[in-house]
Amino acid sequence: MQYQVDTHTHTVASSHAYSTIHDYIAVAKQKGIRLFANTDHGPAMADAPHFWHFVNLRVLPRMVDGVGILRGIEANIKNIDGEIDFFGDYLKQLDIVLAGFHEPVYPPSDKATHTEAMINTIKSGKVDIITHPGNPAYPIDIEAVARAAAEYGVALEINNSSFEVSRKGSEANCTAIAKAAKEFGTILVMGSDSHVAFSLGGFARAQAIIDEVAYPPSRLLNRSPSALLAFLAARGHETVADLIPLFSDDEPCC
């Protein structure tokens, strides 16, 4: 099954990634990806792009060769209050805001602190998707996080990269997250967390977990471009309005 949406990618603007926007578009066309989000790391990361990078994302075209591009960020959760490293009206210029824990910005501490920080991020209203919440370096109260995400309409990510090149040992946590999401009605999304274009749309390990717990396809944001765009519009991203008509006739892949 080929999903047509990938919400989590990094370009050479984050210097530990290796592909350009052009590279991603080329691979998207090859793989049948119709919509992807450009979500480079937030400015608090040492090798992240400058703040101006995110302000100027508006120069990216909406569609190139039939592939839609979302202008976004993977922000960093900075503290227990759930603050992130992007702010104010600038957030409104973005189509999609991801956020997660990253060791160089917010070192791991303990389960209670991680849980409070993640839930406060969810409650802030600034973040659409929590990235790699299954990271074993940051244990959380999974049920509490899933309940909060369901209540505030924030999606939790099943991060495919966590099973391949980073965050080793995430499988059990991600399975528990998927089960809790199924129970509490939490929205899930699969993210490739691609740092090279060849990984775009690579969801095999994440999909195996989704299938294992029989998570409802109707709540999975990857099911169609229109599903993701409707989610973002409902969360107040007026910037996606010009993309919505371009995908109005799409069909869910599952």
Swiss-Prot record:
Binding site for Zn(2+) 2: H16, H41, H195
GO CC annotation: cytosol
Coiled coil feature spans: none
InterPro entries for the chain: Phosphatase_YcdX_put, PHP_dom, PHP_phosphatase, Pol/His_phosphatase_N, Pol/histidinol_Pase-like
SMART domains from the UniProt entry: POLIIIAc
Keywords: Hydrolase, Metal-binding, Zinc
GO biological process terms held by the UniProt record: bacterial-type flagellum-dependent swarming motility
Enzyme Commission code(s) on record: 3.1.3.-
SUPFAM superfamilies xrefs: PHP domain-like
GO molecular function annotations of the record: phosphatase activity; zinc ion binding
Alphabetized NCBIfam families for the sequence: PRK09248.1
PANTHER family per record: PHOSPHATASE YCDX-RELATED
Family according to the record: Belongs to the PHP family.
Name by which UniProt lists this protein: Probable phosphatase Sbal_1472
UniProt source species: Shewanella baltica (strain OS155 / ATCC BAA-1091)
